[in-house]
A protein has these predicted regions:
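Short, small-residue-biased leader/transition segments that mark boundaries at the very start
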Residues: 2-13
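C-terminal helix-rich "cap/oligomerization" subdomain common to oxidoreductases
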Residues: 9, 222-224, 232-270
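Rossmann-fold NAD(P) dinucleotide-binding segment
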Residues: 16-34
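A short helix->loop->beta-strand "cap" motif at the edges of active sites that frequently abuts
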Residues: 27-29, 54-57, 148
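A contiguous active-site-proximal alpha/beta segment in oxidoreductase catalytic domains
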Residues: 38-95
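Mid-domain beta-loop-alpha active-site segment that forms a flexible
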Residues: 61-68, 91-122, 135-136, 253-254
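Contiguous beta-strand/loop segments that form the cofactor/metal-binding neighborhood of enzyme cores
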Residues: 109-188, 192, 224-227, 231-244
Length: 270
């Protein structure tokens, strides 16, 4: 089939992503590459140039983008001014050759960049290696050109797992639990303003005065569909190949997430 002739499934360590993907792209094979896209940002840029030259599709496996908890937010206006993210896991010998920044934190960095849509202005990072020879616990404060700030924490030495993100903006507070797959939204609306713009039942919690205006506080817990994120990711990749459309997580976005990861890693280990 056309699809069979244009893509090639493979599994390899992230440090060899570039070499394997390079060979596939040179043979005009579309690639779905696990995150991080490559071992270095320099390799990612080179891969993007090759993909454009050979007119092939490259999608990167930032699978959290397909988490159904994140999908429900398409019905909301998300414009963060402050983001707090925690991604914690219990220790496992798996992937100890790569830092927690590359393995876990990169998920939240990708999502935050996708939400904020502004260039990064400043990064302050700290971390420590406890059980391995790479960073096991890391924290980064990322300041964006538009004034937004993100505080991101990742650990692979936690007693219990956690994958949560909290988003604060002038008119709303949004809490996302990627692990348990639920979303809670608190919104401030003017009296008479319809809170049901996404057909989600809203509960009025009370009213406050803000900016010399009376505002109403609403709570919403939108239903999260039962979806398999990995399957949705693969479907999106196949759809892009068959229909020629863009992929949800392109190589450019993945390369930028990796660039930020490299800055954080360099700060911690310099």
């Amino acid at each position: 089939s056309t699809l069979h002739n244009t893509l090639f499934p493979y599994t390899t360590l992230f440090r060899s992503h570039f070499e394997v993907a390079k060979k596939c792209i040179e043979k005009a094979k579309h690639c779905l590459i696990e995150k991080p896209i490559t071992a270095t940002h320099e390799e990612a840029v080179s891969l993007i140039e090759m993909a454009e030259k050979n007119e092939v599709i490259v999608q990167v496996g930032h699978v959290e983008r397909f988490n159904p908890a994140l999908a429900v937010l398409k019905n909301y206006k998300v414009g963060p001014l402050f983001v707090e993210a925690h991604r914690l896991s219990q220790f496992s010998p798996r992937a100890t050759d790569v830092s927690v920044i590359h393995d876990l934190m990169i998920h939240d960095i990708d999502i935050i960049l996708w939400f904020v849509k502004s260039p990064v202005k400043k990064i302050d990072a700290n971390g420590v290696d406890v059980l391995t020879e790479t960073t096991d616990i890391a924290n980064a404060r990322i300041t964006f050109e538009n004034g937004a700030v993100a505080n991101v924490t990742a650990s692979r030495l936690s007693a219990s797992p956690m994958r949560k993100m909290r988003i604060f903006q002038p008119d709303a507070y949004i809490s996302i639990d990627f692990g348990k797959q639920f979303v809670e939204v608190y919104r401030i609306l003017e009296p008479g303003e319809d809170p049901l713009d996404n057909s989600v039942p809203a509960t009025m919690l009370g009213s406050i005065e803000k900016g010399n205006k009376n505002k109403e506080i609403y709570y919403e817990k939108p239903p999260v569909p039962e979806l398999n994120a990995i399957l949705e990711e693969q479907r999106a990749f196949i759809k892009a190949i068959m229909e020629g459309g863009p992929v949800p997580v392109g190589a450019d976005e993945a390369a930028e997430a990796l660039r930020i990861v490299e800055i954080i890693d360099k700060q911690i280990n310099s």
